[in-house]
C-alpha cells in the first residue's frame, strides 16, 4: 500500500497546532527575506512539476518578489505576497498558509451563505443556504452580474485569481468561481448584484466569516447512504478523513450495500483524505488483486550535479492491493460519479477504480491534482506545502495536471440548477439499469 499523506491531512495538522495569537506586525525584513528564500530553496530542490511549467523562470520570480515582500506593510500582506509567489507554480498541492489567528481575523468567506459556479459562461448561484437571502428572493439558478460594482469576471481576475493554486484550467476555474469568488477580508462585506429569471436585478450585501474547510472535514459526515431507483444503492463519500471512525461508519453502511442490486458511488465535492481509507473502501468491491498507481519524486545527488547531469528521479515499483479474504465481496454493478471538484485522494480513488475495471465513471473531468506535500515552517508560524511526488496510473498514464476523463460526460445546466435536478446522478441510474 502506498504510504501517502494527502494535502488535507497536512492542513488538519497545520490548523490544529497553529492557533495561538501573535503580533500582527511581528516580522522583520530579515524574517521576510528568509521566508521567501526558504520557499525558493525548498521548491528548487523538491517540487515535482517543473516539467509542466517549462516557461517559468523560478530564479527570476524569486528576484522579482524580494522587493515586494520587503514593501509589505504587515504580516498578513507579507503572506499574501508569498501566496502569489507560490501560485506561479500552478499546482493544487503546493501552497502557503498563514498562522490561523491571522487567517481568522483577515480572511473570510460567504460559502455558508451561498455557493456559486461558472455554468454556460455565467456566474450562477447553485445553493442558497442563508434564510435571510431566501426570504429576499434569492434562488439557485440566478446569475451574479456584478461584484462590488465590477463585472464578476474582471473582479475575479483582479482579486481572486492571483491567490489560487490549481494544477489544471478547470480546477482553476472551479477555485476562482466556486470556492473563492466571494472570499476576502472578514470586516468587509461583499456587494453582489443578482439577476432573477425575469431580468430584474437585486442588490445584496453578503457578510464574510472565518471558515476552515479542514476543520469542517473533521466534524462533518464523511459518508451518506440511501437507496434510489430499483434497489440501487447510492453512497456519497464526502472525504476520506478520520481513519477509525470512517472505517466503522463504512462497515455499518456496507451491510446495507450488500442488500442492493447495484451501487452508485459519488465522490463529487470530495477534497481527499487518506489513501488507506480510500483503498479500504475499494477492497470491498474487488474480487481479485488490483494494482495502484506508480509515482516518482525528484532526487538530488550532488556529485551527479557536479558532472552536469539533469534532474534525476526516484521511481516507485508497482504496488498491488489484495482484496479481503474474510468479508463478503460486493460483485454487483457499480458506477462512479466524479467531476472537477473531485480532488487529491479522491482522484486516486477514481484511478484505482478504473484500474479495477469495476464500472464506468459518469460526470466530468476530475481536478487533476494529487501528490505528497512537504511541509515547511515559515516565519510567523505560517506553513508552505510543496508537492514532491508525481502520480501515474499503473500503466504510466498521467492524470496530475490533466484530470481523469469520465466514460460518460454529463454536466449540469443552468436549468438543472434552477429545477434542482442532478443530471449526473440521473445518467448514472440510467447507465447502471441498462
Enumerate the predicted regions with their spans.
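Generic detection of intrinsically disordered/low-complexity segments and helix-coil linkers/edges
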Residues: 9, 14, 28, 34, ...
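Bacterial Sec-dependent N-terminal signal peptides
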Residues: 1-24
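Conserved acidic, small-residue-rich alpha-beta core segments centered on
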Residues: 274-421, 426, 431
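Generic recognition of cysteine residues
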Residues: 8, 19-21, 61, 345, ...
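Flexible, low-complexity junctional segments that flank or bridge functional domains
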Residues: 21-263, 267-296, 370, 374-377, ...
Amino acid at each position: 500500500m502506498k504510504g501517502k499523506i494527502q494535502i488535507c491531512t497536512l492542513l488538519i495538522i497545520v490548523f490544529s497546532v497553529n492557533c495561538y495569537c501573535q503580533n500582527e506586525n511581528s516580522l522583520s525584513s530579515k524574517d521576510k527575506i528568509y521566508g521567501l528564500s526558504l520557499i525558493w530553496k525548498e521548491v528548487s530542490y523538491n517540487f515535482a512539476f517543473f516539467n509542466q511549467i517549462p516557461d517559468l523562470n523560478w530564479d527570476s520570480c524569486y528576484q522579482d518578489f524580494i522587493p515586494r515582500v520587503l514593501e509589505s506593510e504587515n504580516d498578513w500582506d507579507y503572506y499574501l505576497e508569498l501566496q502569489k509567489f507560490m501560485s506561479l507554480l500552478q499546482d493544487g498541492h503546493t501552497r502557503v498558509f498563514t498562522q490561523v489567528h491571522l487567517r481568522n481575523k483577515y480572511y473570510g468567506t460567504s460559502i455558508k451563505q451561498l455557493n456559486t459556479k461558472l455554468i454556460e459562461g455565467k456566474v450562477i448561484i447553485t445553493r442558497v443556504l442563508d434564510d435571510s437571502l431566501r426570504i429576499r428572493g434569492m434562488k439557485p439558478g440566478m446569475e451574479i452580474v456584478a461584484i462590488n460594482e465590477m463585472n464578476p469576471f474582471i473582479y475575479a481576475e483582479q482579486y481572486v485569481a492571483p491567490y489560487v493554486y490549481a494544477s489544471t484550467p478547470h480546477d482553476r476555474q472551479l477555485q476562482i468561481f466556486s470556492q473563492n469568488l466571494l472570499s476576502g477580508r472578514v470586516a468587509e462585506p461583499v456587494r453582489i448584484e443578482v439577476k432573477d429569471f425575469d431580468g430584474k436585478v437585486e442588490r445584496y450585501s453578503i457578510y464574510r466569516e472565518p471558515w476552515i474547510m479542514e476543520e469542517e472535514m473533521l466534524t462533518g459526515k464523511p459518508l451518506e447512504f440511501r437507496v434510489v431507483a430499483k434497489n440501487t444503492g447510492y453512497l456519497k463519500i464526502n472525504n476520506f478523513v478520520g481513519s477509525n471512525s470512517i472505517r466503522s461508519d463504512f462497515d455499518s453502511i456496507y451491510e446495507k450495500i450488500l442488500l442492493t442490486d447495484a451501487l452508485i458511488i459519488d465522490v463529487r465535492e470530495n477534497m481527499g483524505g487518506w489513501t488507506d481509507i480510500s483503498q479500504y473502501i475499494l477492497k470491498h468491491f474487488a474480487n481479485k488483486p488490483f494494482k495502484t498507481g506508480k509515482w516518482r519524486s525528484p532526487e538530488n545527488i550532488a556529485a551527479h550535479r557536479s558532472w552536469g547531469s539533469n534532474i534525476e528521479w526516484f521511481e516507485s515499483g508497482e504496488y498491488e492491493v489484495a482484496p479481503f479474504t474474510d468479508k463478503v465481496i460486493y460483485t454487483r454493478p457499480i458506477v462512479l460519479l466524479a467531476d472537477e471538484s473531485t480532488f487529491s485522494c479522491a482522484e486516486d480513488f477514481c484511478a484505482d477504480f478504473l484500474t479495477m475495471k469495476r464500472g464506468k465513471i459518469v460526470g466530468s473531468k476530475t481536478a487533476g491534482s494529487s501528490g505528497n506535500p512537504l511541509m515547511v515552517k515559515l516565519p510567523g508560524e505560517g506553513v508552505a506545502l510543496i508537492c514532491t511526488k508525481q502520480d501515474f496510473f499503473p500503466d504510466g498514464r498521467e492524470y496530475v495536471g490533466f484530470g481523469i476523463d469520465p466514460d460518460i460526460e454529463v454536466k449540469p445546466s443552468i436549468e438543472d440548477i434552477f429545477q434542482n435536478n442532478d443530471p449526473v446522478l440521473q445518467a448514472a441510474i440510467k447507465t447502471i439499469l441498462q
